[in-house]
Amino acid sequence: MYPLKSKRGFSYSNRRFNSRNIVFNRPVSGKRHDGKRRGGNFVKPNDEPKMLAQRIHENQYGPEFVLAHNSAISTFIPVIHLGQVPKPSRSRSYIKLKRLRFKGTVKIERVQSDLNMDGFMPKVEGVFSMVVVVDRKPHLGPSGCLHTFDELFGARINSHGNLTIVPSLKDRFYIRHVFKRVLSVEKDTLMVDVEGSTTLSNRRYNCWSTFKDLDRESCKGVYDNISKNALLVYYCWMSDTPANASSFVSFDLDYIG
């Protein structure tokens, strides 16, 4: 209440304030809906099949996996064909290698039962080795064969110690896993368990295997069609006494493809 001066004195009057809505013209940043479709980034549907977690099973056994004493063989883990049905298969020209597991047996068998001068049968003492190697740039040489154990590791006698790739081939090959057993056999035969696993990809490193796939006929999983990261397996049996080592090993390769 405020006093107002007049001729008759002071009087009081209520002074009212009416609130007013102040309107500001603000720019509108929303989408315009004028019935017109405007250009933008649209995600095209992917026609390629989804890459799935799968597993390849491979058994390595038979006459070609019988090692005479002081000998070695080389082989590889075959990968699957493109679009092969039923699974396992691969949907692209590359797969992600996750883990390789193996399990099996090795039979050590004496070749001959000759007695020594004391009339006793000598022991069969030796070293059995199985080595998993990654070939970064797979290709066959002029001979059309895989690198031998001696070419890759220097000599078979090196299996008694710490195996390493020869310096001239370190840029192409690297050792992923070594399984080794030092054996002493008094009987004519002995069965040895073989089991292990190795991780090929982890959180810090991914191992991708790629393929050439030039045409439909070449979309295979053989060594000659792999252009990056093939898995090789080397077997070696060293013994001074004549004896054979027969291996039966099953491999399970986990991959995404």
Swiss-Prot record:
Bilayer topology annotation: Peripheral membrane protein
Biased composition (Basic residues): 29-39
Gene Ontology cellular component annotations, sorted alphabetically: host cell; host cell cytoplasm; host cell nucleus; host cell plasma membrane; membrane; viral capsid
GO molecular function, one term: structural molecule activity
Top-rank taxon, per record: Viruses
Family named by the database record: Belongs to the begomovirus nuclear shuttle protein family.
Protein name in UniProt: Nuclear shuttle protein
Organism whose genome encodes this protein: Tomato mottle virus (isolate Florida) (ToMoV)
